[in-house]
């Protein structure tokens, strides 16, 4: 009887476990890390773990003389390159600006080369050519044969440690070359330092100024075999007679016996605080010399993350989907040490904090889809860590982050994009109630600033082009989204007066609508709209928009689609304008921003302000058109090839759009908790939710030609709505979607079945 009761208890526990109903599958096999590494995708290729601080991978020669001035090497890697200079420990993924690529290590032999090689002239400096057939990239692992050195390089990583394994097939003057002056983009080393502790341990730092204006990277380096000799250099001159060197551009060659030890392993721990912490990170995360085990652990971490969604479909779609999901976990990266210490934006060290601090907040991009995706997939702890980091940044710099990079505020892009993320965490109950007041203080203080036109918004008026000669409309529309978020948060917290004020502010977008041309247009202080006016003009930083034109910004009102429809005079005119937008010529008239890519008509899937556009149709009763547009964007602009992303992945937002859309839904209004149905690409997807329940989406009649939703069932019952809410999703259960090659124009058409019935 006792044994029987025990078995019953055990079975009950297993029944509640997500793994009991959804056993772990081998999903890392479907990831192709090279997708998005060619052309404008700018994704990181190398070894890391989900959200890891260390992103260890190859750095190449940025071809700054091409038509994009080297733009396509922002991550440090581009698939079309045929050379590798060496391996660095920090990288950005999908960004439109380059930086990082810190702590360069070159596994070399022969003459010590002090400078990176020039393009197509590998003998002029360090680096090696390689063949694509000898390059392997998998989640948590990167491998390549460096032809010029005849060194097999294998890389893996933990959260804070890069783990190298080098097999030397040429032993002549074998050495590891460390270049602390190596830089990416306009970055520049401002101070550097290396100290030898013993024959297998070195510590140091690299301080630099670039996109991150005051970056500090401390490191500790340990080798598996003794270093027999060390040569230190300042720039290109050797420095003798010391085990400690300091200067603006310190370099070192660490020589070892490659005849006796053909294989050398290297661990590099990083810290923003100290070399002591960097050493401790190595001890905590990689206490043993076992590369195979470290590689397996990295793979297991990725596999566990990918299993949050079990997605069934054809092989190609599965590869695209899981690679997209993989890319959504490259940022925001961990930015603290194993002991909880981190460097704040105010350059003070915060010791032993009770949350995991993060950085690389590309918020103008990620507030739209990536953070809503994290809210569906990750437990409260991780999402709380994101918010607690933002609140700490607020306390340190006086406002919420805009684009936070390695302890630095870059103020890149427009608007106040942290506010929607913070507000959403409060509205959905993700943040602990004890933190609500600080969160509100941060939101309100940030929204009540004076910079970048906010002084006009505070007074409930438009930003005149007399005061802001470019991007005024972009700033204003993004402010309106943030103000809506503040309004909803104030309502949640019972702050009636604040709610009334921000309700007025989020509708200020209406003041930019020029009925004469049917677009949002910049206005002079005297009330006149900008003339002459060209709705297609998209020259970078020379119009009223940011990385777009008037056509593309006409739809950037996700917080108030009802109000936007009313500006056009109702559903009919709104749909007519939307149809024109998605079917007109894609010609931008020359000198357009490089960020405007992936065009269907003027709809630009390659840049974030249009990511919600396909799902607007459902608000006006023609959800079927949105299904067709979303399917077309997925089929044309997401492929399994190296150039398989039509634009910058933008720290995972481009990929997050695909993850949502391929499952057949998207959060058009990122904080409303409403997901609009589109056109699922799979046969079945099972999502493990933060509450450990599962939501299974089953698709009938899945085929490339079947873009349209014919009908939906929810837990076996007919479901006529073109949307589903966050609260409903968290209940788990099933959604059955039947697809068709012809549209069901009545599906989701009734006013009560449109998202507008509950959103706004």
Report residues per predicted region.
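Bacterial Sec-dependent N-terminal signal peptides
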Residues: 1-25
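Accessory carbohydrate-recognition regions in carbohydrate-active enzymes
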Residues: 24-420, 424-477, 490-511, 517-518, ...
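ATP-dependent phospho-/nucleotidyl transfer catalytic cores
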Residues: 482
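Beta-strand-rich recognition domains
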Residues: 696-701
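Extracellular attachment/recognition segments
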Residues: 708
């Amino acid at each position: 009887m006792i044994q029987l009761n025990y078995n019953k208890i055990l079975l009950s526990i297993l029944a509640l476990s997500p793994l009991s109903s959804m056993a772990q599958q081998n999903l890392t096999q479907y990831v192709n890390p090279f997708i998005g590494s060619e052309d404008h995708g700018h994704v990181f290729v190398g070894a890391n773990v989900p959200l890891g601080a260390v992103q260890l991978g190859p750095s190449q020669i940025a071809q700054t003389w091409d038509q994009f001035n080297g733009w396509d090497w922002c991550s440090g890697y581009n698939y079309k390159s045929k050379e590798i200079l060496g391996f660095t420990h920090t990288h950005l993924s999908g960004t439109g600006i380059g930086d990082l690529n810190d702590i360069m290590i070159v596994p070399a032999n022969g003459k010590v080369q002090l400078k990176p090689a020039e393009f197509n002239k590998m003998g002029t400096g360090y680096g090696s050519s390689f063949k694509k057939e000898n390059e392997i990239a998998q989640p948590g692992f990167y491998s390549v044969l460096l032809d010029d050195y005849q060194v097999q390089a294998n890389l893996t990583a933990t959260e804070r440690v890069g783990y190298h394994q080098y097999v030397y097939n040429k032993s002549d003057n074998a050495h590891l070359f460390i270049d602390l002056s190596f830089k990416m983009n306009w970055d520049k080393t401002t101070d550097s330092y290396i100290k030898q502790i013993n024959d297998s341990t070195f510590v140091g730092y690299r301080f630099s100024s670039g996109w991150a204006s005051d970056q500090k990277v401390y490191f500790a380096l340990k080798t598996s075999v003794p270093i027999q000799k060390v040569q230190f250099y300042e720039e290109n001159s050797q420095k003798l007679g010391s085990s400690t060197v300091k200067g603006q551009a310190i370099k070192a060659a660490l020589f070892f016996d490659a005849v006796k030890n053909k294989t050398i392993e290297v661990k590099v721990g990083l810290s923003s605080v100290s070399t002591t912490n960097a050493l401790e990170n190595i001890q905590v995360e990689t206490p043993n010399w076992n590369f195979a085990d470290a590689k397996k652990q990295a793979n297991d971490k990725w596999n566990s993350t990918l299993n949050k969604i079990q997605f069934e479909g054809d092989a190609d779609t599965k590869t695209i989907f899981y690679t997209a999901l993989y890319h959504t976990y490259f940022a925001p990266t961990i930015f603290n040490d194993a002991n909880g210490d981190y460097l704040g934006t105010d350059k003070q060290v915060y010791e032993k904090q009770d949350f995991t601090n993060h950085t690389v907040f590309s918020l103008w991009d990620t507030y739209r889809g990536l953070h809503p995706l994290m809210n569906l997939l990750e437990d409260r702890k991780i999402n709380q860590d994101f918010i607690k980091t933002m609140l700490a940044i607020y306390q340190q710099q006086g406002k919420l982050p805009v684009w936070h990079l390695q302890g630095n505020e870059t103020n890149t892009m427009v608007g106040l994009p942290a506010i929607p993320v913070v507000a959403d965490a409060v509205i959905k109950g993700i943040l602990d109630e004890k933190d609500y007041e600080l969160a509100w203080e941060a939101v309100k203080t940030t929204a009540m600033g004076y910079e970048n036109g906010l002084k006009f918004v505070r007074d409930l008026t438009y930003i005149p082009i007399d005061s802001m000669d470019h991007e005024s409309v972009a700033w204003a529309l993004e402010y309106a989204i943030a103000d809506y978020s503040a309004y909803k948060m104030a309502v949640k917290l019972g702050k009636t007066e604040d709610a009334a004020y921000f309700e007025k502010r989020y509708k200020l977008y209406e003041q930019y609508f020029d009925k004469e041309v049917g677009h949002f247009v910049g206005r002079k202080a005297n009330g006149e709209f900008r003339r002459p006016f060209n709705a297609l003009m998209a020259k970078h930083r020379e119009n009223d928009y940011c990385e777009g034109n008037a056509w593309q910004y006409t739809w950037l009102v996700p917080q108030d689609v009802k109000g936007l429809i009313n500006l056009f005079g109702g559903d009919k005119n709104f749909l007519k304008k939307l149809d024109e937008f998605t079917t007109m010529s894609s010609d931008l008239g020359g000198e357009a921003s490089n960020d405007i890519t992936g065009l269907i008509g003027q709809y630009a899937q390659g840049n974030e302000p249009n990511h919600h556009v396909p799902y607007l149709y459902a608000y006006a009763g023609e959800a079927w058109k949105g299904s067709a547009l979303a399917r077309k964007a997925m089929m044309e602009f997401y492929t399994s090839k190296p150039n398989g992303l039509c634009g910058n992945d933008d720290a995972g937002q481009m990929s997050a759009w695909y993850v949502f859309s391929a499952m057949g839904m998207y959060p058009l209004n990122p904080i409303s908790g409403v997901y609009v149905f589109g056109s699922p690409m799979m046969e079945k997807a099972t999502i493990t939710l933060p509450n450990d329940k599962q939501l299974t989406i089953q698709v009938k009649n899945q085929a490339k030609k079947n873009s349209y939703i014919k009908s939906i069932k929810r837990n076996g019952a007919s479901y006529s709505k073109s949307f589903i809410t966050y609260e409903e999703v968290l209940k788990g259960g099933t959604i059955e979607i039947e697809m068709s090659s012809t549209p069901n124009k009545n599906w989701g058409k009734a006013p009560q079945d449109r998202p507008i019935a509950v959103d706004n």
